Amino acid sequence: MSGLIDTTEMYLRTILELEEEGVVPMRARIAERLDQSGPTVSQTVARMERDGLVTVAGDRHLELTDEGRRLATRVMRKHRLAECLLVDVIGLEWEQVHAEACRWEHVMSEAVERRVLELLRHPTESPYGNPIPGLEELGEKAEAESFLDDSMVSLADLDAGNEGKTVIVRRIGEPIQTDAQLMYTLRRAGVQPGSVVSVTESPGGVLVGSSGEAAELEAEVAAHVFVAKQ
């Protein structure tokens, strides 16, 4: 039974991730992000629909029900709080944190969540700069900001006028956090939330970095690195 619960929670979190980045939640997008077959995704989504967690709209995009959104928010909150704990207290390497938090998100109790918040002085963002949702459910006064706002743009969408200029890294999207080698490369190049980095177009996409170190990112990777102008 726990395997089914873990799978359901993983799907719920993935749908919320897609919504955050402004991507329409479709079964095909879930299959891409979770590297699962179409039939497997369809079967799981059908079960979630029967359980009242999602609905499938006429154009086949997925919508979370009130209960589905409540559960998805809790899973995402646990995931990002776990990431904070793993970095700030345990000292796990940045590139290893996401995968470990994917395990913790299914077992962390609300009591532990509250203790983590106290221990870490009430964080509102993950180590990757992503807002921790649903904090008000734990009695927190400060609500997390939206994932995207008008001040942010992905590296892939940076206009030509910003070519060769410096920007501030704001968020590292969930999809690329699964690639430990890529995350290591980003860390080495100083591409972390709060860092000021230079951006230059390259044959393979964009070249981004600071302090003499740089990482070349393909467009599909750059699409998940969100920055703001200085």
Predicted regions located by residue number:
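Extreme N-terminal segment that seeds HTH/winged-HTH DNA-binding domains in transcriptional regulators
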Residues: 1-35
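Basic amphipathic alpha-helical segments that dock to polyanions
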Residues: 11, 30, 41-51, 194
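Helix-turn-helix DNA-binding elements, focusing on the entry/boundary residues of the two helices
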Residues: 27, 45, 83
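Key DNA-contact positions within bacterial/archaeal DNA-binding proteins
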Residues: 39, 95
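A short, conserved structural fragment
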Residues: 49-59
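Basic, amphipathic "hinge/linker" alpha-helix immediately C-terminal to the N-terminal HTH DNA-binding motif
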Residues: 60-79
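Mid-protein regulatory/catalytic core that forms ligand/cofactor-binding pockets
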Residues: 106-219
